[in-house]
Amino acid sequence: MAGLKQHSGLVVPLDAANVDTDAIIPKQFLQAITRVGFGKHLFHEWRYLDAEETQPNPEFVLNFPQYQGASILLARKNLGCGSSREHAPWALADYGFKVMIAPSFADIFYNNSLNNHMLPIKLSEQEVEEIFQWVWANPGKKIDVDLEAKTVTVGEKVYHFDLDEFRRHCLLEGLDNIGLTLQHEDAIAAYESKIPAFLR
């Protein structure tokens, strides 16, 4: 898995607070247990005018022409509240989002996002409001995220964010739980070699 060190991308300004996981990916799409294929159902109830997903809602921000190809989601507080479905970050990642910026995230959603190699950035409500205003005023322009420096650069302004160092290390190095285990492969093999044959 590739590491996430710096990222430059378009921002979708989702001007809503308390966006729950059912809005992100409704329950009727949760049958699959693989991580791919959910992006087309992302924000289903808001994004489409029909259940068959053939009529995009022209009033929903994800369908606006200037935000096509966006990889950064900007939202208000408590993003990802509701049920703990891991399909929510799967859908966001499958759509193409790599970074999310909000004043706060639901705890389980926050951890699930990190586990799925997406970067959830917490900034103050005032900072998030400033970014909303900039994005609305500058359609089509990208912002820059630097995980090594823990900064978000929006126009001429630089915002600083915090992230647990262990989580930061995993994102920088592209490590999931399996990758973390493999970092200790030699130590595991050495330990296993000491186990009596009849216990192996």
Curated annotation (Swiss-Prot):
Q: So, what pathway does this thing act in? A: Amino-acid biosynthesis; L-leucine biosynthesis; L-leucine from 3-methyl-2-oxobutanoate: step 2/4
Q: Could you say which EC number(s) this protein's record lists?
A: 4.2.1.33
Example of a GO biological process term? L-leucine biosynthetic process
Which top EC class applies here? lyase
The question of whether Transmembrane helix is a record keyword is answered with no
Q: Which CDD domains match?
A: IPMI_Swivel
Q: Show the GO MF annotations.
A: 3-isopropylmalate dehydratase activity
User: What single Pfam family name could you report for this chain, choosing any that match?
Assistant: Aconitase_C
* Protein name, entry field: 3-isopropylmalate dehydratase small subunit 2
